């Protein structure tokens, strides 16, 4: 159709963990030209006797593994607009600002590489 795609990196990570696929391979399978925005968020881990289930809840900081996957996404798709989603259990403003600064730093790294 030619329309752009919003890539939810946290959802890719959560789904990969829950369903047993490689999130990096998933990113590599997406054509470079289609991703126009990236979303990041935190997730909740629900533990059970027989394992765990990650839930894309948007109520926690971005996990380190998601930051790593985000860096891979920015390398692949370029420094495109990024939104950090945090819907419930909002922290202090300083925490939100820190998350935004971390995303900005990764975008700036990519800008510097392109220059």
Regions from the language model: what does each represent?
Residues 11-24, 64, 92-94:
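Active-site glycine- and acidic-residue-rich loops that bind
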Residues 81-87:
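Conserved active-site loop/cleft motifs that coordinate metal ions or position small ligands
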Residues 20-77:
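Gly/Pro-rich active-site loop or hairpin
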Residues 93-114:
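C-terminal helical cap(s) of enzyme catalytic domains, especially alpha/beta-barrels
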Residues 11-13, 42-44, 88-90:
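Active-site-proximal loop/turn and secondary-structure-junction residues that shape catalytic pockets
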Residues 66, 77, 81, 96-97, ...:
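Rossmann-like AdoMet/SAM-dependent catalytic core
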Residues 1-4:
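Active-site acidic/histidine proton-transfer and metal-coordination neighborhood
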Residues 8, 38, 82:
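Conserved, mostly hydrophobic/aromatic
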């Amino acid at each position: 159709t030619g329309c752009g795609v919003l890539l939810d990196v946290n959802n890719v990570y959560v789904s990969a963990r829950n369903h047993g696929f490689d999130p990096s391979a998933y990113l590599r399978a997406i054509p470079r030209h289609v991703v126009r925005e990236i979303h990041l968020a935190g997730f909740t881990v629900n533990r059970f006797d027989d394992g765990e289930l990650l839930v894309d809840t948007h109520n926690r900081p971005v996990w380190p593994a998601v930051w790593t996957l985000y860096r891979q996404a920015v390398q692949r798709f370029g420094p495109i607009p990024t939104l950090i989603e945090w819907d419930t259990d909002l922290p202090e403003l300083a925490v939100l600002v820190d998350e935004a600064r971390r995303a900005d730093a990764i975008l700036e790294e990519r800008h510097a590489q392109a220059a």
